[in-house]
Regions:
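Intrinsically disordered, low-complexity sequence elements enriched in Ser/Thr/Gly/Pro
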Residues: 1-2, 42
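A detector for short, charged/polar N-terminal pre-domain segments
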Residues: 3-10
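A structural motif detector for beta-strand N-caps
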Residues: 11, 16-19, 23, 29, ...
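Right-handed parallel beta-helix/beta-solenoid
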Residues: 26, 46-53, 74-76
Length: 87
């Protein structure tokens, strides 16, 4: 499920990426090419800092986020997952 965060940001998913229908992606997320996001994974970038700013969660090309993984960025925290990474 791809959904907006309270600020209105929608994930950007490369056309070659695969997101399992049971996975949840919410907010300011950038998913690179040939990324695999497995069943029941949850990736949330939905908290802003006191100035309303939010850094994205970025998943580099050719990475895979396996079944049931949860990634959540807190306000003011940047999450960058490099290329060819498996979590």
């Amino acid at each position: 499920m791809i959904r907006r965060n309270p600020r209105g940001d929608l994930p950007v998913v490369h056309e070659t990426a695969f997101v399992d229908p049971t996975a949840i992606l919410c907010g300011h997320i950038i998913v690179g090419e040939n990324v695999f996001i497995g069943p029941y994974a949850v990736i949330r970038a939905d908290e802003v800092d006191e100035n309303g700013h939010m850094d994205p969660i970025t998943i580099g090309a050719h990475s895979n986020i396996q079944d049931g993984v949860v990634i959540h960025s807190k306000a003011g925290g940047r999450v960058e997952i490099g290329e060819y990474t498996s979590i």
